[in-house]
Amino acid sequence: MEKFTTYTGVGVPLQRSNVDTDQIIPAVYLKRVTRTGFEDGLFSNWRQNDPNFVLNTDTYKNGSVLVAGPDFGTGSSREHAVWALMDYGFRAVFSSRFADIFRGNSGKAGMLTGIMEQSDIELLWKLMEQTPGLELTVNLEKQIVTAGDVVISFEVDPYIRWRLMEGLDDAGLTLRKLDEIEDYEAKRPAFKPRTNA
């Protein structure tokens, strides 16, 4: 997993609340057996049926920092929702409230979910409306987002923050203990069952 310390990308204002995982990626797109290629399903109902949807505009179609309304990622636990956002190009999502499971899935996959006050979310929306294509700089170490001269703080779970800054997914966490695992396996009695790769 790629380390996340600072990142700059075009901010995308998603001025909708209660965006659930089925709206992020409908179930029809969940039949794939790979972990990539889900970007075509991202917000597909809105992208296909609303020509004015934010990701259908030239200004925001290549955005990578999503600023969403409250209660983002609610609904069923669907890792595909995180994968779709990441496959599209998003590195960070900010909201005043996230579903806990969505936040956990995001952190494990390498995407930052930062919590801001709703008034700060609305300030970012206003700034992005005034300056379409505004770049947002996310500093995970300092837990701030910079938009022009405006600096806004955000919260993130300390453990997820550490994992993102270290670039550690679940496999990476296990590999940090590889010496101890190999030492244990070497000392384990030969008559006990083993799994071979």
Curated annotation (Swiss-Prot):
InterPro entries for this protein: 3-IsopropMal_deHydase_ssu (IPR004431), Aconitase/3IPM_dehydase_swvl (IPR015928), AconitaseA/IPMdHydase_ssu_swvl (IPR000573), IPMI_Swivel (IPR033940), LeuD (IPR050075)
GO terms (molecular function) for this protein are: 3-isopropylmalate dehydratase activity
Question: Where does it sit, as one GO cellular component term?
Answer: 3-isopropylmalate dehydratase complex
Any Pfam family the entry gives: Aconitase_C
Q: Which organism is it from?
A: Corynebacterium glutamicum (strain ATCC 13032 / DSM 20300 / JCM 1318 / BCRC 11384 / CCUG 27702 / LMG 3730 / NBRC 12168 / NCIMB 10025 / NRRL B-2784 / 534)
Q: Which family does it belong to?
A: Belongs to the LeuD family. LeuD type 1 subfamily.
| HAMAP family the record matches | LeuD_type1 (MF_01031)
Q: Name one GO biological process term.
A: L-leucine biosynthetic process
The alphabetical list of record keywords is: Amino-acid biosynthesis, Branched-chain amino acid biosynthesis, Leucine biosynthesis, Lyase
Question: Catalysed reaction per UniProt?
Answer: (2R,3S)-3-isopropylmalate = (2S)-2-isopropylmalate
* Enzyme class, UniProt record, top EC level: lyase
Among Gene3D superfamilies, the record links this protein to: Aconitase, domain 4
Function per UniProt? Catalyzes the isomerization between 2-isopropylmalate and 3-isopropylmalate, via the formation of 2-isopropylmaleate.
| Stated name of the protein | 3-isopropylmalate dehydratase small subunit
Pathway it works in: Amino-acid biosynthesis; L-leucine biosynthesis; L-leucine from 3-methyl-2-oxobutanoate: step 2/4
Assembly with partners or alone? Heterodimer of LeuC and LeuD.
- State the EC number(s): 4.2.1.33
Q: Which domain of life is it from?
A: Bacteria
| Induction context | Repressed by RipA.
Do you know which PANTHER family this protein is assigned to? Answer: 3-ISOPROPYLMALATE DEHYDRATASE SMALL SUBUNIT (PTHR43345:SF5), 3-ISOPROPYLMALATE DEHYDRATASE SMALL SUBUNIT 2-RELATED-RELATED (PTHR43345)
